[in-house]
Amino acid sequence: MGHFSSMFNGLARTFSIKRVKNNNGNSDAKEAADDMAKDAKKKELILKSSGYVNAQGSNNSASIFSKRGEKGVNQDCALVWEGFGCQEDMIFCGIFDGHGPWGHYVSKHVRNSMPSSLLCNWQNILAQATLDLEGSNKKLSRFDIWKQSYLKTCATVDQELEHHRKIDAYYSGSTSLTIVRQGDVIYVANVGDSRAVLATVSDEESLVAVQLTLDFKPNLPQEEERILGCQGRVFCLEDEPGVHRVWQPDAKTPGLAMSRAFGDYCIKDYGLVSVPEVTQRHISTKDHFIILASDGIWDVISNQEAVEIVSSTAERPKAAKRLVEQAVRAWKKKRRGISMDDMSVVCLFLHSSSSSSLSQHATTFK
């Protein structure tokens, strides 16, 4: 109990500046979270473009790279926030993959809204849980707090997007794959078909890939059951065998190749949801790094290949870019005649360079 109380008290001091002025509850917490984001951006702790983040004294570092495919504007985007919520032991990472005519606007809106909203909800739920447990012997679960925070955040972001005056998300949407590292635990929240893969040392002392997320495709049994139960349809087109898509009951639209996403309100009544799957994992010294990538990478690169590409990159800042470059080569070789997808990668390194075989140089890709 003492650990969580001190955690809350430290965060509460940061939020209290806004609450001294008035007592508007959630609106104040949201404003404070937005101010934290602005301050972090000034201190170069938030990265939204291709580059590298490594705060002084932090065990975390992250490499980002995004490349436009051959289908038009790049609808992928990413974000890393080191020192998330002014907490030295926290980092937030995310990959957001848009689709549809307004997909690039949707993905950027989700990217920009989610971190502050998540921080606000985490603060409020943590505060309430701390108050509820005062004087009791119940064990406070950090996972339950993060899960509730993510569920509330995703519902809020999707609702805001539906009523956005400048973004038409009726036939457009975005996936979202995010990770929060807090000390020696990571919390993963997945909406869609981007994927997180962990590189860890096996009992045989080799570096192996462990997939941390499910690709939420419409033909997964639990996903298809929900869609069919809501009168939606799931089938492949004749010229795309093996590519299962979600369709409205009486029309050949929209043909969405994932079962969870923000936006896409044309089929929200027919089984598509924006509910995240939230999981946790305790980090050990055997865990080296985590790769977050949009589906364009995984269409042509296996989990193990991705781990080997990143681990063999001498400089951490170049890791994400090198993985994308290898995927571009694989697209040209394996998927000739098919327009290359947008591809984005975040490589989150879990230990300082002094305890890793990968060298580290702070640099930014232009």
Where does each model-flagged region fall?
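PP2C/PPM-type serine/threonine phosphatase catalytic core
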Residues: G2-K366
